[in-house]
């Protein structure tokens, strides 16, 4: 929602450097869900497993990701935080062999670890 994705991506790049395989897409006020879906579709590759990070589970971006998961090999992680994005970008450049499901779990766990009280 809004510029949250751009802000998270910029913050992540301050820490881990440029991330060529990461793109932020903004759902701006007045933008229709259909327009957002078309924008997301233009960057998805049906041959590449992709993670879509969204801010709120059940919000328009996560609902669109769910719909697109029927057509593309994508997984959606809702409730994104900076730690998750940093971990995802660091793992992209890693030589560590792991399945897509293991990659998703690793990112999820990294995000949870950074939530402390």
Predicted features, each with a name:
Residues 1-117:
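N-terminal loops that bind phosphate or other acidic moieties
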């Amino acid at each position: 929602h809004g510029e949250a994705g751009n802000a998270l991506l910029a913050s992540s790049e301050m820490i881990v450097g440029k991330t060529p395989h990461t793109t932020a897409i903004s759902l701006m006020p007045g933008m229709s869900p259909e327009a957002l879906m078309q924008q997301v579709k233009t960057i998805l590759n049906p041959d590449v497993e992709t993670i879509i990070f969204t801010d709120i589970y059940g919000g328009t971006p996560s609902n669109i990701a769910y719909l697109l998961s029927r057509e593309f090999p994508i997984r959606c992680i809702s409730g994104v935080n900076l730690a998750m994005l940093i971990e995802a970008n660091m793992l992209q450049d890693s030589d560590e062999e792991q399945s897509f499901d293991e990659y998703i779990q690793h990112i999820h766990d990294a995000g949870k670890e950074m939530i402390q009280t």
